[in-house]
Amino acid sequence: MPEKGAEGTMKQVPLYEQIYRTILSDIESGVYAPGEKIPSENDLADIYHVSRITSKKAMKMLAEGNRIIRLPGKGSFVADEKAFKRPEEKNTEQGSRLIGVILDGFSPSFACNILNSIQESCEEKGYSMVLRCSGGSLNKETQAIEELVNLGVCGFIIMCVHDENYNERILQLVIEHFPVVTIDRQLKGISVPFVGTDNVSASRELTGYLLEKGCRKISFVRPKAHETVTLMDRQYGFQLAFNDYGLIADEALWITSLCSTLPETMGDKYLQQDIAIVDQYLREHEEIEAFMASEYNLAKILKYCLEKAGRYKEDMIVCFDGPELFLGEAEFTHVAQGEKIIGKMSMELLLKTIHGEERPGTVMAPYRIIKRYERNWG
């Protein structure tokens, strides 16, 4: 496609720019509506008989111009510039200073302090908070988002459910440039602000505590969740700790089929199933010296079964999280996440997103390793 240069000479427009202009024109004319998926790089290469490198350049130009949003594993979608009006453009309707908070659940061992911190930050900034719990269900998470959007919230703080698939409704919010901050569980590869813990480093340090004590036959224990980022990061940190000692973690010792700590499968029925699984595992693997549990409640199940079998020894279980202590010592050596900081920073990031300010994409809150014998004196 030739066009006139500055002095009237003809110059050839690069193929990638021709493709870029064509798709941009289609977006502006409504051929591709906001939120609609556009052809992939491979499709464009076939359509225009060009290399994938050429089509990739065109897609990059569209993304850099904020005309499309690229979601790994999902495709590229037309960004909706009109879907979200910033607070300063809104009138003062009741919903304009509401923040939607969606958690998959919370307990004394985790998330209560996050929630309190978000609430305090909302009050400090003159916002109100509306809370919904998804109970670990993608459908309930979607319903909560729809309900709160209809209620008029101007942004979301979301603890995504444990699932290998990302919630399509959250991805739609991203495409629409609706302010969203995720906490605890990161949507890797998706351009969404995140506040949480460096689970790889925390797990690596916690496992190193056991290895330093001389333990080698260590069982990694996690729920039977899908390949969620948080759990996979903790598993990876566990493996890295072994590598630090020139060792390889024995996956035959791992327990990864428990489900009673997941929100959608809580209850006595599932708890008894998990106890039976652990009991059998202990009988089959008498060589296990210690356990690294990815969650506090899994550590409680392990302790119960070990005591029942007469095999429990002090400090043979480490875990993530634990109830806040008051004049007492920790039941297990564990990772204490910076919940209050996570809550405060998630609100700060959300407000920056709402007002269109520059903000970091990822914030890692500090954590601590609390030894079993340490006391919290308030």
Walk through the language-model features, giving the residues of each:
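Flexible loop/hinge segments that line or gate small-molecule binding clefts
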Residues: 159-205, 321-332
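Hydrophobic alpha-helical segments within soluble ligand-binding/sensing domains
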Residues: 193-220, 240, 271-279, 337-355
